[in-house]
Amino acid sequence: MKRKRILIIGPRGSGKSTLAKYINANPGPVRRVQDTIYAKATIDVPSAYLENTWMYRHLIALAQDAWCVLMLFDARAKESLYSPGFAKAFRIPVIGVITHYREECADPDRVYKQCLAAGIGEETVFFDGRDATMLCACLNELKERKGI
């Protein structure tokens, strides 16, 4: 049986690879690549899959190898790349992760509303690129609830 991983999706520059590095406990530098990366505990998907609506079917197919989806939202971005209700396309739990929220130009309240519009309920956490404690606690709680 295949080991289920965490699917990480988000716009360009939102911190997908950095987050994957923390979850996988990888001490190496973050590398920029154009391919889907299957790591020990994550599936890191390039932003091109999200930027092109005709690639959505590939995101949904990749979710078959995952036990949950992390949808990243950049607090600096003015617009969301996610379609309304996009999270509902997945049959596995979806967690919204708001990144870059401590920067001057960030607007976490606006981005939280984008999370709600994308179909993510209460499952929203913040990640600043340095401390993944809150996110790891959320993932562990979700694992316990799902019996994974």
What residues fall within each predicted segment?
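Canonical P-loop GTPase G-domain recognition
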Residues: 104-148
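Short, well-ordered alpha-helical microsegments
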Residues: 16, 78-81, 135
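Loop/turn-to-beta-strand initiation segments
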Residues: 40, 67-68, 93-95
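Structural motif
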Residues: 11, 46, 73-76, 100-101, ...
